[in-house]
Amino acid sequence: VMAAGASRIIDRNDNPAEALGANAVDVVVDLVAGPSWPNLLDVIKRGGRYVTAGAIAGPIVELDLRTLYLKDLTLMGSTYQDKICFKNLITYIEKDEIKPIVAATFPLKEIGKAQEMFLKKNFVGKIVLTIPNDMV
């Protein structure tokens, strides 16, 4: 993650408010959610944004609505983008300007091992399955 440009990494099991302080960031991008979700809102500055595109730690979260309206936060789900966004993304990848972070690669026949790794949730990046040439 540091190689991708992060200036600091906080373990998802740590309290971000303790690590960063309250009202420390403008935007939180979260793919985890789960029980520690309210702690993420604590670090967002007034008028800030929270963006999610996943919930691997659990989709049900607790929200104190006062945090939402008193801090004037914007909560956003992100699973769909305009076609031009995807086209631009592909262009960046082809130009090697964006490099996906790959945690592990498994042949399709080892999908069970890939699933075991996914369920452990102790990796950074994507788990890739490769398809045999005779199946393409």
What kind of feature is each model-predicted range?
Residues R12-N15, L31-V32, I56, Y80-I84, ...:
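Short beta->alpha linker loops
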Residues V1, V28, L40, L75, ...:
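Terminal peptide-recognition signature
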Residues G34-P38, G58-P59:
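Short glycine/proline-centered loop/turn elements that form peptide/ligand docking sites
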